């Protein structure tokens, strides 16, 4: 009886969670993630190149963002600037879609049957849970993206090219490194869920406080300019707090260097480069992720409101 009771309560809990699932959030999140990454992929490439720049001789030396972009353009043209774009778009679209999908379901589940709004810590935990669930699915795509972006001899049709595309990379990593290879950087990636958690917490609170400030309903839809402002502020806050983990993660996923684990990366980076090593690439990262975040959130908010309104009209 006890086992049946636990089983019944467990299935009841799951059915309650799934009652809050809205596929509109998934579609809207995918739309925002894909559009923002297609527009700003070259800056993501620059960020990755700078993040792993640790003095290794085989790597090109870059003097700044513009020098990096022009060097890649001269060597490989537009295709070089969009190296790794396929897994990036797949990964970003899927990640944002799943993140918004899980986050809104968790948030709705937690607010069911209560009059008061969620506390800041509840937004934080909900976003962290959504981020961890998303990473379990998407980590192999991020490893693939990093490997493709770090092929420095990526001349078209080059016989020296290690990976030929997204699926070739996935197959080769699995063949030579197994599942463990596909989940390199997973631990710092889990820590990275704190970035999304902080961002979503700040985003929710800023929207709420802003609507209260101008005497609007808490859930009132914002204008495009207002969404951009709130998204930009929340992203800058999150980046400033969590950037070092991205450097650690990128170095773990880099095929040109071998590290035994997270502690090894942190120790070697600190010894060779000091605190600055953990913030390499932050300038191109901020330049890229702030507008990318704004595009993602503006597209998400507008598409989700449109789709959810359609759902209501069909009832």
From Swiss-Prot:
Major localization listed first in the record, in broad terms: mitochondrion
Q: Does the keyword Transferase apply?
A: no
Task: Mark the Solcar repeats by their residue spans.
Answer: 20-109, 118-209, 222-306
Per UniProt, the keywords (alphabetical) are:
Membrane, Mitochondrion, Mitochondrion inner membrane, Repeat, Transmembrane, Transmembrane helix, Transport
| Topology with respect to the bilayer | Multi-pass membrane protein
> What GO biological process terms does the UniProt entry carry, in alphabetical order?
folate import into mitochondrion; mitochondrial FAD transmembrane transport
Q: Where would you find the membrane-spanning parts of this chain?
A: 26-43, 89-106, 123-143, 186-203, 227-243, 281-300
Catalytic reactions on record: FAD(in) = FAD(out)
Concerning its family, UniProt says: Belongs to the mitochondrial carrier (TC 2.A.29) family.
> What is this protein's name?
Solute carrier family 25 member 32
Q: Which organism is it from?
A: Macaca fascicularis
Q: Which gene encodes it?
A: SLC25A32
